[in-house]
Amino acid sequence: MKEERNYNFDGVSTNRLKQQLLEEVRKKDAVQLSIFELRHKITELEAKLNTDNEGSEWKTRYETQLELNDELEKQIVYLKEKVEKIHGNSSDRLSSIRVYERMPVESLNTLLKQLEEEKKTLESQVKYYALKLEQESKAYQKINNERRTYLAEMSQGSGLHQVSKRQQVDQLPRMQENLVKTGRYNPAKQKTVSAKRGPVKKITRPNHLPELHP
């Protein structure tokens, strides 16, 4: 159960109360301004994290990755076909060897150059895609770090908002404590003075004018 608090400001001058009230209002306005700025920044951060935009960086990276996967699939199919040809039955291998044996030297040299060119092409593609994967990995890590930073800032803004709420709840008791410290408010002394003075007498005034004698 929450503790109920009774606030008594008897004996405090009106000017002092006005000063304290204006000070608390100023603090409250400053807190509300900070809350507004934090909410605005949170909105901006959430907009940056929105991936539904057609031109978003995440979508571009996703499409690039799909293209990269398609190229790798084609290379896998091509290499599988080459492996199947190499690991065929013995009769096929022997027939291929016989074909090469019957080929002239010039044709063999031409075929060798062609195979070397294919090898270089494959090696270049492997290097290209390896570099591409490394770049994509670094870019993803950068975006992920930015996302964590945005989430941390949003969490910090939410925490400050909760602190400002607690500060507003504690404003009134602080006002009374400040008045007591400055000696402008003493509840016990005020009660003693009121007891010495006794009840306040009510002053009555006649409701009619006095009679005039000739």
UniProtKB/Swiss-Prot annotation:
**Keyword entries, A-Z:** Coiled coil
Q: Does the keyword Coiled coil apply?
A: yes
The family line of this record is: Belongs to the CCDC169 family.
Region entry Disordered, spans: 155-214
Q: Cite the InterPro entries for this sequence.
A: DUF4600
Coiled-coil region(s):
29-154
List, as start-end ranges, the regions of compositional bias called Polar residues: 155-170
Keyword hit for Coiled coil: yes
Tell me the protein's name: Coiled-coil domain-containing protein 169
